[in-house]
């Protein structure tokens, strides 16, 4: 995005200082415009008032214009019906970690939480031509979590919840506290032209200073008919992830810098739940490392061990369900550690002896089709429980639930010239189009 000139920065400063001299909420017909209060004051009450006045009226508009920055000092739910929320400016979440840990909305998955819920129907959230959006103040959270996985209390900045027939577009999410976007219990949602960037600047967080775990770009959960197009993601975790009961999903034109790429999962974590992921198309995706984070994989599938060991978020397992009717097309790889793989031995209890449960999963993967995948792998992954999986493709399916109907067409993945191992590993997998274990 083009940086503002010195003149525009000066204008911004003047507008910010003068904000208190003009009404912070102005209404003109069915359009409500919010001007920030400034001086670190909470803008949530005025934003919610604008939504009440203009966001629930047919044809209504709530406008948060550029170049303003709006302070989000408390959780908020914006309920929109037949209206538009235009975010030309930036929603900046406060640095009050104690508040967010204790007051964010709870999410019914892995004891997670969110800071901003968007609910309703037939609405548009638009960042405009310069991509307004969100600043999650994420560095505070990356340092606070200090490399821990799924640390309780880190809220997601954008939570599309119980929404139908909605479009979110032209949005930038910088430094998200946790996952950038969660689409949850929703249907017929279009998300187009997003930029997500999670970058750690604190070298004390990990030896390499690269830690940006749990900063997914977007996750879908209990949602149907979701379209994700024209995304750029830079971070350290899944760019796009499909959680349980994500159906009829279309993903196209996604560029990924760093992290594990496109993820199906995690799935089967809860023994009392059935997780279904079905009818998913992923097309035209490019993946490569960022300046800070390796590219772990291009596309991968992950289900939990088949016994319930430990408790969520990092333990669990024994759940049921299936991934079915998936098409992955036109995947371009650059310097990817493990381009394509299936993992049915998932647990985040790394200090435990999980290898004894690696063939216990009854979660099913079937009818998965891969076409036109090219680029290079690094053959550097060695940390799968009890195995070296330095391959281009590793399909590690459970003995209790073999993977069936996996097809590959036009696959061209090169490995380093000095690599002498196998290129493809198949365990308990019915595969067509690839020479298994060769």
From Swiss-Prot:
InterPro entries the UniProt entry points to: Glyco_hydro_28, PbH1, Pectin_lyas_fold, Pectin_lyase_fold/virulence
Reactions catalysed: [(1->4)-alpha-D-galacturonosyl](n) + H2O = alpha-D-galacturonate + [(1->4)-alpha-D-galacturonosyl](n-1)
Signal peptide per UniProt: 1-21
Keywords, ordered alphabetically: Carbohydrate metabolism, Cell wall biogenesis/degradation, Disulfide bond, Glycoprotein, Glycosidase, Hydrolase, Polysaccharide degradation, Repeat, Secreted, Signal
Residues of this chain annotated as glycosylated in UniProt: 28, 102, 111, 197, 245, 253, 279, 325, 353, 372, 388, 418
BP GO terms, sorted: cell wall organization; pectin catabolic process
Enzyme Commission code: 3.2.1.67
UniProt keyword Glycoprotein present: yes
PbH1 repeats: 186-222, 223-244, 246-266, 277-303, 323-344
Subcellular location: Secreted
GO cellular component, one term: extracellular region
Record: active site: 237 (proton donor)
Record Pfam families: Glyco_hydro_28
One GO MF term: polygalacturonase activity
Paired cysteines (S-S): 397-403
Keyword Hydrolase: yes
Function noted in UniProt: Specific in hydrolyzing the terminal glycosidic bond of polygalacturonic acid and oligogalacturonates.
Recorded family membership: Belongs to the glycosyl hydrolase 28 family.
Protein name in UniProt: Putative galacturan 1,4-alpha-galacturonidase A
Top-level taxonomy: Eukaryota, Fungi, Dikarya, Ascomycota, Pezizomycotina
């Amino acid at each position: 995005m083009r940086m503002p000139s010195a003149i525009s920065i000066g204008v911004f400063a003047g507008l910010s200082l003068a904000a208190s001299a003009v009404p912070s909420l102005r209404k003109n017909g069915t359009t409500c415009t919010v001007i920030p209060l400034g001086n670190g004051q909470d803008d949530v009450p005025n934003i919610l008032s604008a939504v009440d006045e203009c966001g629930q009226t047919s044809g209504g508009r709530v406008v948060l214009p550029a170049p303003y920055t709006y302070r989000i000092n408390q959780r908020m739910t914006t309920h929109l019906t037949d209206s538009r929320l235009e975010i030309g400016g930036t929603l900046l979440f406060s640095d009050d970690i104690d508040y967010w840990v204790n007051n964010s909305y709870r999410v019914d998955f892995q004891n997670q939480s969110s800071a901003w819920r968007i609910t309703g129907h037939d609405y548009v959230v638009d960042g405009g031509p310069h991509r307004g959006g969100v600043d999650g103040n994420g560095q505070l959270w990356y340092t606070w979590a200090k490399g821990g996985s799924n640390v309780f209390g880190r809220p997601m900045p954008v939570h599309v919840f119980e929404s139908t027939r909605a479009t979110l577009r032209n949005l930038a999410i910088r430094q998200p506290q946790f996952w950038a976007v969660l689409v949850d219990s929703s249907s017929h949602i279009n998300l187009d032209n997003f930029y997500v960037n999670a970058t750690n600047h604190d070298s004390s967080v990990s030896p390499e200073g690269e830690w940006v775990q749990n900063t997914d770009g977007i996750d879908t959960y209990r949602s149907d008919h979701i379209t994700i197009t024209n995304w750029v993601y830079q971070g350290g975790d899944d760019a796009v992830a499909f959680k349980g009961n994500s159906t009829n999903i279309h993903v196209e034109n996604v560029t990924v810098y760093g992290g594990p790429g496109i993820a199906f999962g995690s799935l089967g974590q809860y023994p009392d739940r059935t997780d279904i992921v079905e009818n998913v198309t992923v097309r035209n995706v490019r993946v490569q490392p960022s300046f800070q984070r390796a590219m772990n994989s291009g596309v991968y599938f992950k289900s939990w061990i088949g016994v319930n060991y430990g408790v969520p978020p990092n333990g669990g397992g024994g759940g049921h369900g299936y991934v079915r009717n998936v098409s992955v097309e036109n995947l371009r790889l650059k310097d990817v550690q493990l381009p394509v793989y299936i993992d049915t031995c998932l647990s985040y209890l790394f200090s435990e002896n999980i290898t004894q449960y690696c063939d216990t999963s009854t979660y099913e993967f079937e009818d998965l089709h891969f076409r036109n995948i090219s680029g290079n792998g690094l053959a550097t992954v060695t940390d799968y429980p009890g195995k070296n999986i330095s391959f281009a493709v590793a399909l590690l399916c459970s003995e209790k639930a073999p993977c069936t109907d996996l097809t590959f067409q036009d696959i061209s993945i090169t490995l380093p010239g000095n690599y002498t191992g196998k290129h493809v590993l198949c365990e308990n997998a019915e595969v067509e189009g690839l020479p298994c274990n060769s």
